[in-house]
Design a protein with these regions (language model features):
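C-terminal functional module detector
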Residues: 2-199
Length: 199
């Protein structure tokens, strides 16, 4: 399976509360990136600068579901694998804009006009975008630029999420990889044989 790690509503990799000085089962201070501090999407129900639902209030770390954040799910999977030999949480990642305005790939902060199309045209709605962001992008390693090849790459989980930069990266992980693998002519075949494709 693939997880949408970031989109215009928020990111779900991890959460860190700078005021509390701690995170949700993590100590990474960079986990403040594009966060929705509620445990639902009610905070995105802001219309003309006013919150329409009381459920949109921020949720304290101790009340926030730890598996709302993907890093915690991955850690749980590794622990389960260590104890039982099975990891049910082998996930791939994608990012998306989740746009409703027919502008795929428009993830640039400087040009962000919103994601709702006609409703974004009015000047009063600009204040509503303080609760969201331009979103992310999905990067998929595919043998060719065709729908079938892209979906095959997604099935292999050779995909990753980015918040706007567009690097071209293909990488593998594993304990049996040769440190000099990048110098080999068949480094991709070696990656598949000795490791796991990571994007």
């Amino acid at each position: 399976p693939l997880v949408e790690l970031t989109q215009h509503k928020a990111s779900s990799e991890c959460r860190f509360d700078r005021l509390a000085g701690r995170g949700l089962d993590t100590t990474d201070e960079l986990c403040t990136f594009e966060q929705n501090l509620t445990d639902n999407l009610s905070s995105l129900g802001v219309v003309f600068g006013k919150m329409r639902a009381p459920e949109g209030a921020p949720v304290a770390l101790e009340d926030y579901g730890r598996r709302n954040m993907v890093r915690n799910v991955l850690k749980d999977g590794l622990l389960l694998e260590q104890n039982s030999g099975i990891n049910p949480f082998k996930l791939g990642f994608i990012g998306s804009t989740d746009t409703h305005s027919a502008t795929p790939g428009a993830a640039d902060e400087d040009d962000y006009l919103g994601h709702l199309g006609r409703r974004d045209a009015g000047y009063r709605n600009v204040q509503d975008h303080f609760e969201d962001n331009p979103g992310g992008l999905a990067v998929v390693w595919a043998e060719e630029n065709s729908r079938d090849a892209i979906f095959e790459g997604m099935r292999r989980r050779e995909a990753y999420a980015t918040s706007g930069t567009r690097p071209v990266v293909r990488f593998f992980a594993g304990f049996e990889l040769d440190p000099a693998a990048c110098e080999k002519a068949d480094f991709v075949a070696h990656g598949y044989a000795a490791g796991v494709p990571m994007g």
